[in-house]
Amino acid sequence: MANAIYDRTIAFAGICQAVALVQQVAKNGYCDSDAFETSLKAITCTNPSNTLEVFGHESQLKLGLECLVKGIDSTPSGSEITRYLISLMALERKLSGRRDAMSQLGDRIQMIERQLDHFDLFDDQMISNLASIYLDVISPIGPRIQVTGTPAVLQQTANQHKVRALLLSGIRCAVLWRQVGGRRRHLIFGRKKMIEQAQILLARI
């Protein structure tokens, strides 16, 4: 498949964007609003004609592409990003082996799509609904992802909802990554190629 590396890079940047936003919300209580919008919209794009359609445009993955290129390193922040990525991808692997959970996830996302006829995706109630999907469907599969940040920030319900909604987006992107042929070996042996592809994409944004 000629576009395999492109598709894998786009999907992996989607996961990176979700975890970078989790890190921002957990520390500060706010995050890049455009990137947040892209990540949440990705959850409801369940029947795309191509990989990029899940996110809209390459420019809407700028945060994720930047994270892919320079955010996964040995600094405390980079180690945290790596931990979130590994945890999300391990959860997705467990999810993919659970037909019941996959079916439930599909049903719940369809319900969100129907609610979009009446509500904005970024209303507090809708973010809460997305968070509850993560809590009800993904969390029980385990193990739980330990999110670290500012305690006073993480104690606020609205921030907890944002974090869980973003983790759900990360799972959705991990599903996409697998659908376009992404495998664990690509993270070990093919990361350099993804970084090169991400640098090309960033240069033209």
Swiss-Prot record:
Key word Nucleus present: no
Major location (coarse): cytoplasm
Stored Gene3D superfamilies: HflD-like
Membrane topology value: Peripheral membrane protein
Subcellular location, record wording: Cytoplasm; Cell inner membrane
Keywords attached to this entry: Cell inner membrane, Cell membrane, Cytoplasm, Membrane
Keyword Cell inner membrane: yes
GO cellular component: cytoplasm; plasma membrane
HAMAP family: HflD_protein
Similarity comment: family membership: Belongs to the HflD family.
PANTHER family given in the database record: HIGH FREQUENCY LYSOGENIZATION PROTEIN HFLD
NCBIfam families: PRK00218.1-2, PRK00218.1-4
Name of the protein: High frequency lysogenization protein HflD homolog
Organism the protein comes from: Vibrio cholerae serotype O1 (strain ATCC 39315 / El Tor Inaba N16961)
